Structures are given as C-alpha cells and as structure tokens.
C-alpha cells in the first residue's frame, strides 16, 4: 500500500504542519502502514522526522517529480498553506484517496476527505458535496504518539513553574518582554525559536509540559498537545491562521 504525506515546515514558517502529520504517520504505522513523508522544509525540521521514511524536497518546485512519485498511490495526505487549488486537483487525480488537512476553509477542495480537528471547525460551514467527506471537530485532532497516553495532571492553584514555547517561529522581542516580566517571581523554562521541537526531543517536551503549572504558547498545534496534558494555557495569537483556533478554544 503506497501512502504519501505532503507537508511543509521550517524555522521561518513553524513546525505545526509537520507535527500534525507526524501524529497521523504514527497512527498509520501502528496499523502496519508506513507512509512516505515529502517535506518542503529546511534542516531545522529533520529532527521532527526522526525514525520516519522521509524526503526533504520542495515539492512545489519539483511538481512533476512529485506527481510521478505519488502516481497510483492508495492515499495522499496534504497539509499545506502554500499549495494552490490546481496542485490539489492534480493530486486528487493521482491517487485513490486524497486527504486534506484544513484550518480555515482555505480552498475549494477537489474530491477527497477534508480533516479539520479544530474546535471551531463546524462553524466554518463547509459546502456539502457528494464527492467530499468531512471529518470535523476535536475528535479528529492529530497528536503525536508520545501524547496518546499522558499521566494524570494535578492543577496547582499557586503558579511556580511556567513553560514558554512559541514553536518554530522567531518572536524574540515578545519572548524577551515576557521573560523580563516573569523572571523576578517565577521559575520558567523557554524553548527558543529554531530549537523548538527539533533539538528538544518529544519525550523531554512532554516532561516539561507535565511539570509546568501553566504554559505560555502560540495558538497553533502546540495548544492541542497542551490541552491533552491538561496544562492551563495562556495562548497568544502569533499568526493569522491561529485566530480561528483560539476563538474556538
């Protein structure tokens, strides 16, 4: 069975798409299906792809190579903000079952399956079509294997330990202001942009989350992992595509 996952990520655009797709990769592997990751990214994303079958390639520039590679596949999953409608249409013609991760009803998708695991997904009013199946709402959130089972969390009413993570995006000025404000009264751990989820292995990230009394985070994929661990979140909208997610929460 040939299954491909097309996505993107890196220091300049963050790692949320790769993180989400890694969860699906882990789930498919669990049932004996080993997909191939095709990742439009840079060196900073490779640690997220550790122990997977992957190829780092700009599949938007190498379209013909990509289409030839996925031709006849059982399934192709796309998680992208960069691919346009013609690209999706071409993919839908190359495989039996195309699957599209979506966050904002970004495109008019061709035939296939649209997955939006955000809490606001039903409010987007996707068009009803016979050739598209929709999987909407938080029951379809894709989490990495390390977050499938988590220890029970005790919520501390007194905040002592704070975790700060903004994913792969570089928000140094904002981070610096937060650190200056907190450093006199709290213990805090922060994960710098470019190292988040790359040099910090997932198991350590999970441990840091569990130890935190509260987490200051961006409003992307990390919020779902924090919610899974039952950690109180102060979420900050760091990009336009996070706004719907935070409104839904």
Where does each model-flagged region fall?
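Catalytic binding pocket for nucleotide-activated donors in carbohydrate/polymer assembly enzymes
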Residues: 223-249
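Active-site and donor-binding regions of nucleotide-sugar-utilizing enzymes
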Residues: 5-27, 38-129, 134
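Glycosyltransferase donor-sugar binding loop
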Residues: 168-169, 190-196
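Conserved active-site histidine-acidic residue motif and adjacent donor-binding/catalytic loop
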Residues: 61, 194-208, 221
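Short internal beta-strands
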Residues: 34-41, 189-193
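Short hydrophobic signal-anchor/transmembrane segments that target glycosyltransferases
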Residues: 174-188
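Acidic donor-binding loop of glycosyltransferase active sites
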Residues: 207-221, 231-232
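A nucleotide-sugar donor-handling region in carbohydrate enzymes
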Residues: 110-171
């Amino acid at each position: 069975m040939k299954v491909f996952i097309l996505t993107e990520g890196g220091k300049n655009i963050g790692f949320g798409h790769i993180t989400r797709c890694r969860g699906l990769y882990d789930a498919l592997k669990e049932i004996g299906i080993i997909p191939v990751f095709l990742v439009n990214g840079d060196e900073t994303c490779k640690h997220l792809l550790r122990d997977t079958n992957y190829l780092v390639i700009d599949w938007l520039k190498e379209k013909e190579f990509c289409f030839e590679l996925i031709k006849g596949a059982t399934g192709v999953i796309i998680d992208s903000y960069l691919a346009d409608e013609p690209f999706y249409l071409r993919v839908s013609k190359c495989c039996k079952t195309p699957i599209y991760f979506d966050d904002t009803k970004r495109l008019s998708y061709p035939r296939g399956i649209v997955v939006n695991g955000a809490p606001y997904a039903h409010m987007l009013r996707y068009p009803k079509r016979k050739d598209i199946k929709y999987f909407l709402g938080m029951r379809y959130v894709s989490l990495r294997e390390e977050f499938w089972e988590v220890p029970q969390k005790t919520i501390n009413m007194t905040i002592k330990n704070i975790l700060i993570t903004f994913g792969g995006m570089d928000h140094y000025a904002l981070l610096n202001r937060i650190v200056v404000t907190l450093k006199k009264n709290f213990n805090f751990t922060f994960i710098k942009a470019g190292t988040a989820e790359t040099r910090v292995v997932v198991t350590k990230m999970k441990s840091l989350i569990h130890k935190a009394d509260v987490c200051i985070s961006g409003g992307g994929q990390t919020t779902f992992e924090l919610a899974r661990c039952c950690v109180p979140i102060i979420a900050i909208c760091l990009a336009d595509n996070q706004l719907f997610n935070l409104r839904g929460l």
